[in-house]
Swiss-Prot record:
Gene assigned in the entry: eva-1
Protein name: Protein eva-1
Major localisation: membrane
Biased composition (Polar residues): 415-429
Organism of this sequence: Caenorhabditis elegans
Membrane-crossing residue ranges in chain numbering: 370-390
Family that this chain belongs to: Belongs to the EVA1 family.
Summary of the function given for this chain in its UniProt record: Acts as a receptor for slt-1. Required for the guidance of the AVM pioneer axon to the ventral nerve cord. Acts as a unc-40 coreceptor to enhance the sensitivity of unc-40 to the madd-4 midline guidance cue to guide muscle arm extensions (muscle arms) and AVM mechanosensory axons towards the dorsoventral midline.
GO cellular component: cell junction; M band; plasma membrane; striated muscle dense body
Length: 461
């Protein structure tokens, strides 16, 4: 496997992207993840009533769904498959422009035209919204393979529930008196849409009991069979089977307008629901067999563990006692040598690849690239300016210290000259320093015997 070292330039731009985005991105970009398809979502989509809409070029359509539901586009077609004289004739301006066309060409263009991205485009505009307005023209669909042909839009959509309620029904224990049956019911004009049903342990129902092991058992098929798309349903607490010994029913459902359900859903004739229930029954049988087998194996294991093994007199017993060891023993086992890793040297291919990535980043993210460059230049300018200021301060401090030392030395020199001239070299250094420290002194300098006039000097520092 060829590896290379990422260049510092690419690392700088990655850092800039992280700073400008304000969040750390994952190292794997655009990775595909496998998501299991939830069968209940397919059942819910098949349960929806299909609302069909048709409009010609230049018209406007509005899609809307009841409260607590959202639009789910099922089909979408924009183009033409029938002649213009049968559906959505061309407008006056377009009809006049087509007057000079070949009749055979007009028949061809007026009969076949299909904008393949129509379904995707309508889904982008209207999915997961409660209300949506679409203008039927070629500008809405961003591509028109047949501009001389008058087209129309045909689509279908359903209203799927967007939020569900959760409720836990505490089932009685075997020692408790029997309680009334569980009843799920919607008000008039609404029906049940069940999303999930489980039997599981719940601290809400057993506040005084410590739950050591959480247990969850799926009972969605049993609840769907009795409650889906119904105005109400009754569930018997002892009729719902699960593997949890002390489980309670936890249902995720919602009551929505009756108008969103299809006739097949109301009658309980959904193909996807029947297939799901059959598969669930088969899996339930396998789970039951596996569960009871595990229980039997566990019982046999407990029986074997509880029973004491027979003692064989011929088998020597070794006591777990180390008192007979008279000295410490050390043993060094041979270990495998550590794996040798080859040193990865930078190569031109890796650097070139990094530079290409930087160029590609510039093309796709111009604003972020400019912001990264501005940020890098600003940081560099701040660092240089700080270095200049620190250098200037250090040099000024050195100059001031030098000037102070020079002034002190100059003053000491002048003082020594004055004192030496006064004493004429006859005074000792001890007397000189004493007079300088006193700062005020009076000295008489006695000359030679020939000198008639006495000379004295007085200095007051």
């Amino acid at each position: 496997m060829n590896m290379h070292i990422v260049s510092p330039v690419l690392l700088l731009f990655w850092f800039g992207i992280i700073v400008t985005d304000g969040k750390l991105k994952s190292g794997f970009i655009g990775g595909s993840h496998h998501h299991e398809v939830n069968p209940i979502e397919g059942i819910l989509r098949e349960s929806l009533r299909s609302n069909r809409v048709q409009a010609c070029d230049g018209e406007r359509i509005t899609l809307s769904c009841p409260r607590n539901t959202q639009i789910s586009v099922q089909t979408g077609f924009y183009g033409r498959v029938v002649p213009e004289n049968q559906l959505c004739p061309p407008q006056a301006g377009r009809k006049h422009s087509e007057a000079n066309l070949d009749p055979l060409s007009m028949i061809h263009h007026s009969s076949t035209c299909d904008v393949i991205q129509a379904h995707t485009r309508i889904s982008e505009l209207c999915d997961k919204r409660r209300k949506c307005t679409v203008v039927v023209d070629s500008n809405t669909f961003e591509d028109d393979p047949c501009p001389t042909t008058s087209k129309y839009l045909q689509m279908a959509y359903g209203c799927i529930p967007m939020s569900f309620d959760e409720e836990t029904f505490c089932t009685p224990k075997p020692t408790d008196p029997p309680r009334p049956e569980i009843r799920l019911e919607c008000r008039e004009g609404r029906r049940l849409a069940v999303y999930s049903a489980q039997m599981k342990t719940s601290p809400q129902c057993d506040p005084e009991t410590e739950i050591r092991h959480e247990c969850v058992s799926d009972v969605l098929p049993q609840v769907l069979r009795q409650c889906h798309a119904k105005e109400g349903c009754t569930l018997k607490s002892d009729g719902i089977k699960g593997h949890c010994r002390h489980g309670h029913l936890h249902v995720v459902y919602v009551c929505v307008n009756e108008e969103i359900f299809s006739e097949e859903a109301i009658k309980g004739e959904l193909t996807s629901l029947e297939t799901y229930l059959k598969e669930a029954d088969a899996m339930q049988k396998q789970d039951d067999e596996r569960f009871f087998k595990d229980v039997n194996d566990k019982t046999q294991w407990e029986r074997v563990v509880d029973s004491e093994p027979a003692k064989d007199p011929d088998v020597h017993q070794i006591a777990n006692d180390a008192s007979y060891v008279t000295h410490d023993e050390y043993r060094m086992e041979k270990q495998d040598p550590p794996p040798i890793t080859e040193r990865v040297e930078p190569n031109l291919v890796g650097v070139g690849h990094d530079l290409l990535q930087v160029v590609q980043f510039f093309k796709e993210n111009k604003e972020k690239a400019v912001m990264c460059i501005v940020l890098a230049v600003s940081m560099a300018a701040i660092v240089v300016l700080s270095a200049c200021i620190i250098t200037r301060l250090c040099s000024s401090n050195k100059d001031s210290s030098r000037s102070s030392r020079r002034s002190r030395s100059r003053r000491s020199l002048e003082t020594s000259k004055l004192v030496s001239s006064n004493y004429g070299g006859s005074i000792t250094p001890q007397h000189m320093m004493q007079d300088i420290e006193d700062e005020q002194f009076l000295r008489f300098s006695m000359g030679s015997a020939a000198t008639s006039n006495p000379h004295y000097s007085h200095y007051d520092f």
